[in-house]
UniProtKB/Swiss-Prot annotation:
The lineage of its organism: Eukaryota, Metazoa, Ecdysozoa, Arthropoda, Hexapoda. Transmembrane segments: none annotated. Expressed in female gonads (at protein level). This is Protein panoramix. The keyword Coiled coil applies. Residues 241-251, 269-279 have a biased composition (Basic and acidic residues).
Amino acid sequence: MEAPMKLEVKVENYVECGINEDEATPLREGTGETPPHAFACGVPMSGSGWCSDPEDGNLVHHSATPTSDEHLQPSLDTIEPKMEPKIKEDADNAMLDSLLADPFENNSPATLQTPADVKPNAMLDSVEQGSRSCELLPSEFSKRENLDDMDLFSLKAAKTLVPDEQQSFPQNDTPIDDPEAADLIAQKREILKMLEMTAENRKVKHKKKKHKKERSHRSNKHQEESRKRNHSNSSSDEGADDKNQFDCDYRGHKKYKNRRGSASSQNESSKERKLRDTELDYVPVRPDEHFIRPIKFSNLIERRPPQVEFNTVNLSKADKRSLAVARAELVLEQIQQKANKEEPPEFHMVDTICKLPVNESFRNQDCFENPSPICNNMNVVYKFNSTPGTRIDLSKWGLETVPEATKRLLRLLGIDVARLKELQSTVKPSQRILKLKKEQLEQGLAPTEEQETATLYKNAATQTERRTATRDAGTQVRLESKLNGAFWQNPHFDPMNLTQHQSNVMLALQEIYQTLPSATMAVKLSRALAPALAIIKGRQP
């Protein structure tokens, strides 16, 4: 077991000492450099701590913490007067000040007095490596405040100190051999050029401010004149007011037009106008831009050429004849393409070969005239017999087959079977076709389609009744005579609900037929057919 360690924590209340903390602390002139052996291992920490001074020399003593009653004891050291802080000047600034303050004489050799902190070899390179602004001056002198505070000569006095390029050589035309003197002259010339540029910029800014003041003064004068004109009761002023009512922009601000004979506009030259326009902080608004004309988004979009829609309702005999000729030519072209085994450029799509019942067909008994086994009505029973020799009228059911040549022709013409039946009932065939049919009937050559029967053979799949019929019952569609089912157990059941449900089924079938296939319809159908699928899966072994 390790022995417990005792730690004594001494809490000291720092009371106000003899030195007031609110007073500004004087800056130190210099700090003692850290000895190289200060952080070496095995060396005592001498010359550091609370009571250590750099003048102690080799005296070794440990740093002691200040006691609590130390501030009550009289201080033995005399309080020295506060020294004003010395601002440390930058090396670049000091060198530039010395360059500007040093007068140049052609006879005496040029010497550069550098401060103590700057190396003697650092000439123009040290100045160029410093931070520079966009005006090729150090960043300390690029600000306006620093330029105003600089203690420099005026431009005229500085030009007298630096000789021009023509006077750079002495009278005996001997060039200066000292390269340092030539560098000094070049530096001072550059500084003078930069100072001239800053002075010109100040003049331009002063002109801009002066122009702005003049503009504001002119606008105030115009406002006062307009107020005086509005208060006058003369007839000429009234006519002017009536005209000025229309000289307003959409924001209600009046436009004041300068007179052509005003002295300010006549004296103003084109250069001054261009200068005034360039001095503006905003883009002037043209007179045609005062009002915004909204444009419809439909006008911005490129319009498609209008498609010509043929009038198929009220056609004249000439139009019908031209359409029939065009249709026949197109059919002949497609037949020729198919004979040459070419890829057809277009196809005629037919919706269906059979018609669905019309809405409210239960009440009108239309759906029972030509029903379809595809539509399984709620209140209709379809009954088939398996007696051989039974002929089912497929045209009644909407399942009539046509010859192969007729199928191809119908596909080319884009006509369905229902439309073909309508044409057969309305259109009268030609005498040639009637003569051919009559000859076939006389010879006993009936069409093969009429001889075919739709007998359902005896097998387990075709039996709809438990017992096989022994007589020709035929194919019939009848209403349920006996009401049997879950609905009829309730004596208060209204049969009209079933008829309404029947019409709803017809409408739903029409919607399913007319709409395009979508994922939502597939989900609805799968939910409705889920019980039937479960029954079929349960029957399978």
